[in-house]
Amino acid sequence: MEFCGGTLRTRFQRTSVPNSPVTVVHTVAGSGKTTFIRNLLIDHPQLVARTYGTPDVPNLLGYGIRDRHGDAHIVDEYPAADLRSHPSVSIVFADPLQHHGEVRPAHFTCSHTHRFGKSTCSLLGTLGVYCTSDKEDSVTFAGAYLAEPVGTLIALGEDAELVLDNHRVEYFTPCQALGLTFPSVTLLTDAPIEDQPPVSRYIALTRHTDSLLILN
């Protein structure tokens, strides 16, 4: 898909990985890859894009990011895919930190997020995840019974889920929260953040736009 190469270079950083039949693009959460794919479809309406995440709602224009079923030129969240199901694929996208599946070497990357802010980037940095942001947000730690939850609740760990179930409080698990964004998130974790599984931890820490309260 040579005609997209210039477009990719305007938005993503080219790595030293040699060209291959399928171009691989890796981004951090909130980088704008979904918007980029939608704009690519506007500029090239002959393309078909499919996602292993949440597809777009059908629209009057007749194009958007479709569900996973069928051939495609573009596949989003590709670590969850069997690319043999998409023989025409030329570009694949993913935030590889959100997946357990095998990932390919990236031709293009983006480590800048438009979702959360600098405080979250600093926290992620202590966990080995490098990303940048131009905006401000807040990250606060507190004891599980010493602060009131704010916004949407995410439970990290089975014991955290059990506590919220016993209190009949609605919450998301990281798997359920994947692909969702909320202004404020309260994360109840049953172990120190650094001891939690990396994929679930990363998803849970990147769902908010303004504030994150971590209760342990």
Swiss-Prot record:
Pfam family, one: Viral_helicase1
(+)RNA virus helicase C-terminal domain ranges (all copies): 111-216
Organism: Lily virus X
Protein name as annotated: Movement and silencing protein TGBp1
GO biological process, any: transport of virus in host, cell to cell
Claim: RNA-binding is one of the keywords in the record: yes
Residues in (+)RNA virus helicase ATP-binding domain copies: 1-110
Keyword DNA-binding (UniProt): no
Purpose: Transports viral genome to neighboring plant cells directly through plasmosdesmata, without any budding. The movement protein allows efficient cell to cell propagation, by bypassing the host cell wall barrier. Increases plasmodesma size exclusion limit. Acts as a suppressor of RNA-mediated gene silencing, also known as post-transcriptional gene silencing (PTGS), a mechanism of plant viral defense that limits the accumulation of viral RNAs.
Principal subcellular localisation of the protein: host cell
Further details from the record: TGBp1, TGBp2 and TGBp3 seem to act together for cell-to-cell propagation. TGBp1 is the main movement protein that physically cross the plasmodesma with the viral genome. TGBp2 and TGBp3 would facilitate TGBp1 function.
Quaternary structure (record): Homodimer and homooligomer. Interacts with capsid protein. Interacts with host AGO1; this interaction targets the host protein for degradation, thereby suppressing the antiviral RNA silencing.
Keywords assigned: Host cytoplasm, Host-virus interaction, Inhibition of host innate immune response by virus, RNA-binding, Suppressor of RNA silencing, Transport, Viral immunoevasion, Viral movement protein
GO molecular function annotation: ATP binding; RNA binding
InterPro entries, A to Z: (+)RNA_virus_helicase_core_dom (IPR027351)
Location(s) in or outside the cell: Host cytoplasm
